[in-house]
Amino acid sequence: MLKANIKTNSKELQKKYKRLEKKLPRLIDKGIQQAGFQLVDIIRTKTKKGIDYQDSPFAPYSEGYLKQLQKEGKPTVVDLWYSGEMMGALTPSIIKKTGRNKATLAFTRKSNIDKAFFNQVLNEPKREFFGFNQRTESIIQRGFNKFMIRQLKGMRI
């Protein structure tokens, strides 16, 4: 007859599992907020380059608006950066109302919401800067995955 004694570290494993279970929701929220900041940066960068969220160039400004910009000494490139106020007011947040594991991008002031709505929806031609395509989504997803891997490795579980 063969006898075998097996030692397990189940208590240590339980302790590590509980620690992971406790920290994981905060790590996910932090990663999602970071993804929100990355999306804001991508939107600002594309807009500054004069391209919409689908990587198409913005429609040109009207002649009247171009004359106004020239008179004021402002750049005439179509980049939606008249004063920088609208794009500066774009911020990400994790609001519990939107649901778990979601980030929301919003403008912080009503006047900037109105400007963005005008450019995105009402203006003809539309200049759709507020959104993202499949390529942008993949970039953000890779960034989130890298962040989570770094954080989990740092926990040494």
Walk through the language-model features, giving the residues of each:
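Short, Lys/Arg-rich flexible segments
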Residues: M1-I157
